[in-house]
A protein has these predicted regions:
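Catalytic machinery of carbohydrate-active enzymes
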Residues: 1-158
Length: 158
């Protein structure tokens, strides 16, 4: 059942960021979501943030206007390196955050459930976010009742 706020927001998004960076399946499952976002917001620019190794797959998904690649392997290599590895990883991620913030997204959907994507959503300071986000202490939060239900099924299915 749609609320008045859902109907009011329909078609108002102009610059959308979709996070689907943790698994190839996230991207493939994002295809119907991308189609729906474009149908409801036909004038919106849709950027997808993906791990560099999955970018070629995204080029074949209709509705994506821009692919922003992040090199997670580089971040992992940095974090496992001695000396300045942590600094290099921080500087790389700081650059990613700064570049994405400069694009002034008005909506973000996090299709991944990883903790670091929730923190990334928090750092981007996008005014309207759905999916996993982080609070001030880095705890993962979900605001959407449907996402809460999905997470409950996934995380408590054993």
């Amino acid at each position: 059942m749609s609320s008045a706020n859902d109907k009011k927001a329909k078609g108002t998004k102009k610059n959308i960021l979709l996070l689907a960076i943790t698994r190839m399946g996230d991207m493939l499952q994002a295809s119907p979501t991308i189609a729906g976002l474009k149908r409801e917001n036909p004038q919106a620019k849709l950027t997808i943030l993906v791990d560099r190794e999955f970018a070629p797959i995204c080029r074949g998904i209709p509705g994506i206007d821009e692919i922003y690649e992040i090199d997670l392997a580089f971040v992992c290599r940095c974090l496992h390196r001695d000396q300045d590895g942590v600094v290099d990883a921080f500087e790389y991620m700081e650059q990613v955050v700064d570049e994405l913030k400069a694009r002034n997204f008005d909506f973000c959907l996090n299709m991944a459930s990883a903790g670091y994507t929730a923190i990334l959503m928090k750092l981007l300071e996008i005014p309207d976010c759905s999916g996993w986000i982080a609070d001030e202490e880095g705890n993962r939060l979900i605001h959407s009742p449907w996402s809460m239900l999905f997470a409950a099924f996934v995380y408590h299915s054993n």
